[in-house]
Amino acid sequence: AQLRNMQTARCNQKRLPNMGFPEALGIAADLAECAAAEIVLLAVPMQQLGGFLSALPQKNPPKYLVSCCKGIDLETGKGASALLQAQAPNAQAAVLTGPSFATDLAAGSPTALSLACADAAAGLYLQAQLSTPSLRLYRSTDVIGAELGGALKNVIAIACGVTIGAGLGDSARAALMARGYVEMQRFAASLGARDHAMESLSGLGDLSLTCMSDKSRNYRYGHALGQQKKFDPLITVEGVATAKAALALAKDQQIDLPITQVVVQLSEDKIEVAQAVDLLMSRPQKQE
């Protein structure tokens, strides 16, 4: 029904109402038809990416698979690029991530994103093919760093939403953003991201946007937690599963992720907001 509505109305009335599709954009129900394209962008929830990839036709796969997912797979502990390489080894994997909301992209608002591909030549080609007058892409070969920035900022955004929802103030949010950024750097480095990986659109850029806008689903989810309100279970909140996956990986790496830990505890109703504040504020004093 959703697909038929999109074909008739030439817009996604459920997600992006009143924003018409470009004339060149076709709408197909056949996954094999979509997979026949040279470049395929995968804009599906992170926790559904593995299942979606298993449904892709194995014969004549796309030459390029570009993940637009932001998160860590809870079942495997892998990022999007690792899932792509495991399930579609004949395709060149890339990650498109950074500070953007779908409404801004659809409206043609000026936007800049990170395009990460381990193959530098493939990244150069994709950059040329996917750039538009309103979308500027910066390429990188640090795929791990790019996808971890996009994943972990969702966790920090939940914490910031809790802070504002609970009425703890903008100063508390700023502290969480700054210390959350350090947490992102520490975790990314432990998993092989390059130095300064978070000093990017996919790291600091996406963190800034997501932690300060109520357009962010993760921020809104945290805001509801802070107000002790129920959140619509039909709305995708990538940061919840990512926080759990990151915490499991951090335990293996013996990496301290205090903000991520309280986000997991809050999302599982194991602690109240006041307890979360006490846990973070009573940590041993340290040098910055």
Stretches with model-predicted labels:
Residues 83-93, 110-197:
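Internal alpha-helical scaffold of NAD(P)-dependent oxidoreductase catalytic cores
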Residues 8, 36, 278, 282:
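Phosphate-coordinating loops and pocket residues in cytosolic domains that bind phosphorylated ligands
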Residues 70-72, 97-101, 119, 141-145, ...:
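Glycine-rich beta-alpha junction loops
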Residues 1-19, 26-29:
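NAD(P)+-binding Rossmann beta1-loop-alpha1 motif at the extreme N-terminus of oxidoreductases
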Residues 28-31, 43-46, 50, 59, ...:
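Electropositive phosphate-/nucleotide-binding environments in soluble metabolic enzymes
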Residues 160-161, 189-199, 203-288:
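NAD(P)-dependent Rossmann-like dehydrogenase/reductase catalytic/cofactor-binding core
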Residues 20-110, 126-128:
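Rossmann-like NAD(P)(H) cofactor-binding subdomain of soluble oxidoreductases
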